[in-house]
Amino acid sequence: MDASTINSLFLIGALLVGASILVSSLSSRLGIPILVIILAVGMVAGVDGGGIIFNNYPTAYLVGNLALAVILLDGGLRTRVASFRVALWPALSLATVGVMITTALTGLVAAWLFNLSLIQGLLIGAIVGSTDAAAVFSLLGGKGLNERVTATLEIESGSNDPMAVFLTVTLIDMIASGQTGLHWSLLGHLLREFGIGGLLGLGGGWLMLQLVNRINLAGGLYPILVVAGGLVVFSLTNALHGSGFLAVYLCGLVLGNKPIRSRHGILHMLDGMAWLAQIGMFLVLGLLVTPHDLLPIALPALGLALWMILVARPLSVVAALLPFKAFHGREKGFISWVGLRGAVPIILAVFPLMAGLPDAQLFFNLAFFIVLVSLLVQGTSLPWMAKLLKVTVPPDPAPISRSALEVHVTSEWELFVYRLGAEKWCIGAALRELKMPEGTRIAALFRNEQLLHPSGSTVLEVGDMLCVIGHEHNLPALGKLFSQAPQRGLDLRFFGDFVLEGDAELGAVAALYGLKLDGLDAKMPLAQFIRQKVGGAPVVGDQVEWHGTIWTVATMDGNKIQKVGVRFPEGTRPGPGLFL
């Protein structure tokens, strides 16, 4: 490879990445997932479009694994351990039982549609059996879904790859060696994948945390150190026959949920690297496919994709979530619909090609076609489906910017900036009248681009920029304080006619609204009653019905229900109520 060739590669690579970024602006306008657009750019530039011939499967495998490791590390850093209280076991059930059921159901139909042996059909099912972390993290961001749904989908997508990889590799070995039966030793291999991956992921994350917090470096080097550490954990786990995907996700989880030096610098840098990883990975996968090869299999492949979306995934979700009573039908329906397939199935489809199996090219083309259908059908309809199934909750107003205050090594103090519009409730109020959350302070006030020296009597005006020092856990309270009038109206329409305190006694509530206790303990707090009705860990947006009224969890403080909204049937006149 001479200098001219290298320069051409740089030019083509930069043009493709730049084109992907520029064209991605069409994503929100057209309602098409950005990942589909990036795939399309790769396909257009490929052999049937721009004429770029790329058929190097080992290179695609290398790029895909590297990109997924970075994406999962970033996803782990942004996942809050607090979400595990509502989603850990359901997500693990989906990641194991759910993947196996999806594999079996998809494999049976694939074998019938394409006249393959049962074990070859099951291999196709295993390849497309897991949801994709890159697709899920990318498409769920900012959708305002309730915590139970969001946490379940994100944890599932970060932890179901070991099962899919295990099933794929096992079935490839069986086909290559001519085996037709399963053996109990396979269970031991699966436990080893999860065990080694979990142990090295948590242990590697803890070691990285100690290293980052104890060593003094230039600020820009900490994100690079974290990425390097994550890749060490990923590759070492794979070398020991564990799940590198699970390990790097857990490594990020540990780093993201402990006080760590240069936290915001790490998150900002990882955000850019994760985007670059997604763009590079989907460009390479788009270049790898030959579009005209998809046409002969389009009809049966579409049938298989729709079978997986409409039958296999929903049945696997219902079965996997059967023991978890907190999930109602709408949540199960939405989780079924967000069985997004992305880069992982395409990368797994490279395995049979590298192993030289018969019909390996068919497996690859099928995986690519199913991913394309999944992203187009499920990805584009995700916002509409969330509204239809009512799994969204009103989001808390967010600051226009936030930045870290590195007052000490593991400082968690942040500076939040709020712009006060005409519709803000606090316009016209003096600073001393604001009920600031405990532990927060107003640091500065800007008006007409000028820094003021405010006092307690300073009155807030439209257009003011308010800078507040606080912690991340103060954001919900600050969001309510600086909320907009339309936002408050949205809250009332969603949560009900009145909002009650969670510690209000059930007997008092029943007396005020003329409801019958039916043998319930009158001293029981309303929050405890709601928790029992939900049947599991509650989240904001959970609804239960009692005597024709709808009771909705409005705010939470950790595991505790703080406020409950109540909506009465149309045409009824409630009692005096407790409007708080």
UniProtKB/Swiss-Prot annotation:
PROSITE patterns: RCK_C
Residues annotated as domain RCK C-terminal: 402-484
Catalytic activity: K(+)(in) + H(+)(out) = K(+)(out) + H(+)(in)
Transmembrane segments: 6-26, 34-54, 57-77, 86-106, 108-128, 162-182, 193-213, 217-237, 240-260, 269-289, 292-312, 334-354, 362-382
Main location group: membrane
GO cellular component: plasma membrane
Gene Ontology process terms (BP): cell volume homeostasis
SUPFAM superfamilies the record matches: FAD-binding/transporter-associated domain-like, TrkA C-terminal domain-like
Family: Belongs to the monovalent cation:proton antiporter 1 (CPA1) transporter (TC 2.A.36) family. NhaP2 subfamily.
HAMAP family cross-referenced by the UniProt entry: NhaP2
Name the UniProt record assigns to this protein: K(+)/H(+) antiporter NhaP2
Organism: Pseudomonas putida (strain GB-1)
